[in-house]
């Protein structure tokens, strides 16, 4: 058996292994996309301009209104979910939402909310056809 040929030295010295650096926002080559925060600001602003065209709203007031809408949404959704569970249904329908609104909002406010919602849904349905 012939002796093994000696290996020729590599023309370039092998690169030294660098210790793995911890990835942080500053060293990461990819730019992090800013997470989108969903708010009701644009809708609140549109309603404000429909009712009071010459009135503005501060950032703090908009934040308060956004929190208010989120709170009411959570309350109605939670109550509607309970109502659906009581009736052994897995779907929240308009009836559950309407009943939840009547339970959560007091007196006249509930009546006005239900009538406005009914009117708006009727208007939306007729526009879609």
From Swiss-Prot:
Look up keyword Iron-sulfur and say if it applies. Answer: no
A Gene Ontology molecular function term of the record = DNA binding
Fill in the PTM field for this protein: Monoubiquitinated by the UBC2-BRE1 complex to form H2BK123ub1. H2BK123ub1 gives a specific tag for epigenetic transcriptional activation and is also prerequisite for H3K4me and H3K79me formation. H2BK123ub1 also modulates the formation of double-strand breaks during meiosis and is a prerequisite for DNA-damage checkpoint activation. Phosphorylated by STE20 to form H2BS10ph during progression through meiotic prophase. May be correlated with chromosome condensation.
Gene3D superfamilies, per database record: Histone, subunit A
Matching entries from Pfam families are given as:
Histone (PF00125)
Which compartment or compartments is the protein found in?
Answer: Nucleus; Chromosome
Where can the Glycyl lysine isopeptide (Lys-Gly) (interchain with G-Cter in SUMO) cross-link be found? 7-8, 17-18
Compositionally biased spans, kind Basic and acidic residues: 1-19
Per its UniProt record, what SUPFAM superfamilies does this chain match?
Answer: Histone-fold
Q: Where is this cross-link: Glycyl lysine isopeptide (Lys-Gly) (interchain with G-Cter in ubiquitin)?
A: 123
Listed GO CC annotations: nucleosome; nucleus
Q: Where is this region: Disordered?
A: 1-37
UniProt keyword DNA-binding, yes or no: yes
Q: Where are the Phosphoserine residues found in this chain?
A: 11
Q: What SMART domains does the record tag this protein with?
A: H2B
N6-acetyllysine PTM positions: 7-8, 12, 17
Sorted alphabetically, the keyword list is: Acetylation, Chromosome, DNA-binding, Isopeptide bond, Nucleosome core, Nucleus, Phosphoprotein, Ubl conjugation
Q: How does it assemble?
A: The nucleosome is a histone octamer containing two molecules each of H2A, H2B, H3 and H4 assembled in one H3-H4 heterotetramer and two H2A-H2B heterodimers. The octamer wraps approximately 147 bp of DNA.
The UniProt entry's sequence similarity note says: Belongs to the histone H2B family.
Q: What does this protein do?
A: Core component of nucleosome. Nucleosomes wrap and compact DNA into chromatin, limiting DNA accessibility to the cellular machineries which require DNA as a template. Histones thereby play a central role in transcription regulation, DNA repair, DNA replication and chromosomal stability. DNA accessibility is regulated via a complex set of post-translational modifications of histones, also called histone code, and nucleosome remodeling.
Name of the protein in question:
Histone H2B.1
